Amino acid sequence: MASVFGSDNKKVWVFITEPNWERPYEDKLEYVERIRFCKSQYSVRMDKFILLFNKIDRIGDTTEENAMQACSNEYEGLFNAFRNHSPLASLFGPKYLFKFVRFTTGTYGVPQPGIPAHYTPSRDNYPAALWNAIIESIKG
């Protein structure tokens, strides 16, 4: 892992978050700090970042803007680690240096005695959005 992290090759980093993560506030702050550390210590200038907001079905099929706000509220300070500090960013560039992807694998039924567990896959737009973000990050 150290050789991959330390290489000068372009990398696409995917950081996974989820709404209503049932962890203490301190654990969430520690997770944000680990992401910050990873970004500052291991990434190189040409690396790209994807912030995956998994289990989006927990808060409904919300807009990207609402999902970003929910993610920002859940993981205090996370977005600041990716803020675009370029002087021209406020006029022309993106506010943050990541692609935000809403994601869900689908829904899982609660197993009941005598009834097999049930799984309903998500709509195709969720994995397609992740795939497109990865491809754009590789090409861009």
Kindly give the residue locations of the regions a language model identified.
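Inter-motif core of Ras-like GTPase G domains
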Residues: 1-24, 41
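A generic secondary-structure signal
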Residues: 3, 34-41, 81, 85, ...
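Canonical P-loop GTPase G-domain recognition
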Residues: 50, 58-138
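Structural beta-sheet core signal
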Residues: 13-15, 51-53, 102
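Short glycine-/polar-rich loops that comprise or flank the Walker A/P-loop
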Residues: 8-12, 44-48, 94-97
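Amphipathic helical hotspot of TIR/SEFIR-family domains
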Residues: 23-44
